[in-house]
A protein has these predicted regions:
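Alpha-helical recognition domains of nuclear gene-regulatory proteins
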Residues: 10-13, 69, 73, 99-102, ...
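Structural motif
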Residues: 47, 56-57, 140, 177-179, ...
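Active-site palm subdomain of RNA-directed nucleic acid polymerases
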Residues: 66-81, 183-219, 228
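Non-catalytic, peripheral interaction segments enriched in hydrophobic/basic residues
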Residues: 69, 215, 243, 247-259, ...
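Acidic catalytic cores of enzymes that act on phosphate-bearing nucleotides/polynucleotides
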Residues: 370, 384-426
Length: 426
């Protein structure tokens, strides 16, 4: 027998008797510093790390098999953009942009609230998840497997070459597991339903577009401040049923539209904590700016690009050829500038600013102060300028958006907008 046949018999037997080996429930957790944190400051704390669980390979193969056979039971709302094939942060960002553009073009101001959850993945209730799965009429054999699996789940912390003692996980879900993101999406799916049912969010052609999710990143979109306050309370109430809490200190409100300069009273959580209005907020890696129309700041992207280029140049700039350094710049540095640009509008001034940053770095690489020489070198090494890269990314993204999302309950509203933008790029 081949190894795959042995695994198939083992997995079928496990599902039949509702049992998983003890090793399947064991993992070790590696703390990784969050993106916005700096490892070289003195104020780093445990809250600045995200734990990623490393599980046995065979258990991951089993999870893939479960997902292949029972994937229909783990389907989440169209308003959840995370953990789905052919769906990315760019799709969530583009949908948000289309919603805002729709209302701003009709002289309305859109009110946003980016809700931050406190340790959402770590606080997920196992019993609450089982209830939600039973409501979906999940097969008893699969439910029994998951119950045994979660009941015996243990992990330890790995720091460098040191391992801690194993301890039991009474709640939460392993970040890094194959099934984990799908189970979490099922768990928070009711938040979307409750917020949509309250009817306070933005609507386009009678379709509710008041809430967008990407994993545990929740964004509320409302036409008025009062409606935003109502949606926040509905969202918070449902989250409390799920044993989850909002972090007001990291949650942000933002206004985009004709009245964006008028600052209303802060909206508050159920316990009275205020969520302040800000001039910008970070959402899925991009920085949305309050203003008359939807726009994003590229300043953080430029700073990241400078850091990455200087790191590459300091390490190998004196020993490697220009071709090697330029290849690393193209593969490691340019993606920091291009991230999310396919989904957001970019002004000509922003393009000039970014291209100036790239030119300055290449002047340093080619040891020249002539812009013409840099342009010749870029052409010789087939290094595309920023504006060309953005147009290519936009065209590729919009083609996929139109092809894949016309059946999506939410995104189908904006397919015509995507087609019009695609035609303008040709």
């Amino acid at each position: 027998l081949q190894f795959c046949h042995v695994l198939a018999m083992l997995f079928n037997l496990m599902i039949k008797i509702g049992y998983v080996p003890g090793a399947f429930s064991q993992s070790y957790t590696v703390p990784l510093l969050k993106d916005h944190c700096n490892a070289y400051v003195k104020s780093v704390s445990a809250n600045d790390f995200r734990g990623i669980s490393i599980s046995p390979v065979i258990s991951k193969v089993f999870e893939h098999c479960i997902l292949e056979r029972y994937g229909a039971f783990f389907v989440s709302s169209d308003y959840q953009f995370g953990f789905k094939k052919r769906s990315s942060c760019a799709h969530a960002t583009y949908t948000l942009r289309c919603v805002i553009d729709y209302f701003v073009s009709r002289n309305s101001t859109v009110n946003l609230c980016a809700v931050d959850l406190s340790k959402a993945f770590d606080k997920m209730s196992h019993h609450g998840l089982f209830i939600k799965l039973m409501n979906r009429c999940i097969p008893v054999s699969l439910l029994r497997i998951l119950e045994v699996w979660f009941e015996r789940c243990t992990t330890c912390i790995k720091w460098g070459s040191c391992l801690s003692k194993f301890y039991k996980l009474n709640c939460g879900i392993r970040q890094g597991g194959v099934l984990s993101p799908y189970l979490f999406a099922v768990y928070v799916d009711s938040v979307i339903d409750k917020v949509r049912q309250c009817g306070a969010g933005c609507k386009i052609n009678m379709a509710s577009v008041g809430i967008l999710l990407y994993a545990d990143d929740i964004l509320l979109v409302a036409p008025t401040v009062t409606a935003l306050q109502t949606m926040l309370h509905v969202c918070e109430t449902e989250l409390s049923w799920l044993d989850m809490t909002i972090n007001p200190a990291k949650s942000v409100c933002l206004r985009i539209g004709p009245n964006w300069k008028s600052t209303p009273v802060n909206i508050s959580t159920l316990d009275g904590s205020d969520i302040s209005w800000q001039q910008s907020c970070r959402y899925l890696g991009i920085h949305i700016v309050a203003g008359r129309v939807f726009s994003c700041s590229l300043d953080n992207a430029k700073r990241s690009f400078y850091r990455a280029f200087n790191a590459v140049y300091c390490k190998i700039g004196g020993v490697a050829s220009e071709e090697v350094v330029l290849h690393l710049v193209k593969s490691k540095c340019m993606p920091l500038l291009l991230y999310g640009t396919e989904a957001i509008p970019i002004k000509k001034a922003q393009i000039r600013s970014v291209e100036y940053a790239i030119t300055c770095c290449l002047m340093k690489l080619f040891k020249t102060k002539s812009k013409e020489i840099v342009c010749e070198c870029m052409s010789f090494f087939n290094f595309c300028d920023f504006s060309t890269c953005v147009v290519r990314r936009k065209r590729k993204f919009l083609l996929k958006f139109v092809a894949n999302f016309w059946r999506n309950e939410l995104c189908c509203v904006f397919v015509d907008v995507a087609k019009a933008e695609l035609n303008s790029l040709r």
